[in-house]
Every structure is written in structure tokens, then in C-alpha cells.
């Protein structure tokens, strides 16, 4: 999320390199773990890198650098930043325009569970599902996040506040990729 206080941000660093910067708007030092995956659209991990991150207050620093040649073809970069084991930022990086990729048709699985104050969706996919839009027929439903990228091998949880019954919610829940 662009407005989060700490972000993992991959960018083109020139000379055929891609770097991952961790940027913190916090007023205290940040420490976390950065993971970077070079993946195929089918979810195959071709390369994994990790780095411990220590970022001073209100600043940023580069932690991982990748050779752009690793991102040729239908490969992309997926980065995850955790703090005390909790995911606080994730991002993707593509080296080409979207219409240059063979995205294929993802098979998306959605499990719905009921909590005391909302429904919790657990979404997974067999291949990358870019720009997945989640919605229901009820305009009053409030999705924590309804426009997401789904990455194979990394299930995504989304909370939804709804006044519908569990059965009605399940039958009206839809997605579009």
C-alpha cells in the first residue's frame, strides 16, 4: 500500500540492475526481513534472496540488487517485507509492459470463514493473477482491499465487513482478473 509507513520498493537501478529499497516514514529505527523472489508467471521460484534490514528513522536504503537478465522472458520480481514475522509490505516489479506477458488464465481458490465482526477471505492461485478485483452484489460491503495481485504460493487474506448472511455472501462474492 502506497500510504504504509514502511515500504519495500523495487526499482530500475540502471546498468541492467533492479534494486529493492526499504523506505521508512517512522520516527524510530526500523528492523525487518526482506525477501525477494524471481518468479515465473506460473509461480516457479527461479531465485530467492533475503536480507536483514535496518533503516534509520525517516529514511530509506537499498538492500537487494538483482541482475536484470534474471527478469527476462515472463519472469517478474516479488518482494515481501516482514517485521517480527508479520508481513508489512509486498510489491511486484515487471520489466516489460503488461501486454508483453502471456498471463494465462489463473485458477483462483477462495475460502470464506466467518469471524465475530467480518468475513475473512483466503485467496490462492496457481499462477499470478494481476489486478484481481473482488466484489459482491451488495454495495454496502466493505473490503479491506478489493484490488490485489495474487502470487502463487503466497495465500492472501482479505477481511470484508458485510451485513449479508454467510450463504448470501458466498453466493454473491465475485472476482475479475
For the regions a language model picked out, list residue spans one by one.
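Short, surface-exposed ligand- or partner-binding patches at beta-edge/loop junctions that are enriched
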Residues: 71-82, 163-177
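Carbohydrate-binding surfaces of carbohydrate-active enzymes
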Residues: 1-145, 150-159
Amino acid at each position: 500500500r502506497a500510504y504504509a509507513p514502511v515500504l519495500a520498493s523495487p526499482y530500475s537501478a540502471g546498468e541492467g540492475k533492479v534494486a529493492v529499497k526499504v523506505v521508512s516514514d517512522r520516527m524510530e529505527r526500523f528492523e525487518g526481513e526482506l525477501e525477494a523472489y524471481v518468479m515465473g508467471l506460473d509461480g516457479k521460484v527461479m531465485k530467492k534472496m533475503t536480507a536483514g534490514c535496518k533503516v534509520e528513522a525517516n529514511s530509506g536504503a537499498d538492500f537487494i540488487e538483482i541482475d536484470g537478465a534474471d527478469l527476462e522472458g515472463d519472469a517478474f520480481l516479488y518482494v515481501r517485507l516482514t517485521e517480527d514475522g508479520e508481513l508489512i509490505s509486498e510489491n511486484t516489479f515487471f520489466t516489460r509492459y503488461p501486454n508483453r506477458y502471456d498471463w494465462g488464465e489463473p485458477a483462483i481458490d477462495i475460502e470464506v470463514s466467518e469471524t465475530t465482526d467480518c468475513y475473512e477471505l483466503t485467496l490462492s492461485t496457481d499462477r499470478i493473477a494481476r489486478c484481481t478485483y473482488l466484489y459482491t452484489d451488495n454495495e454496502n460491503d466493505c473490503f479491506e482491499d478489493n484490488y490485489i495481485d495474487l502470487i502463487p504460493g503466497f495465500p492472501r487474506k482479505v477481511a470484508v465487513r458485510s451485513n449479508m448472511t454467510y450463504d448470501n455472501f458466498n453466493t454473491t462474492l465475485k472476482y475479475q482478473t
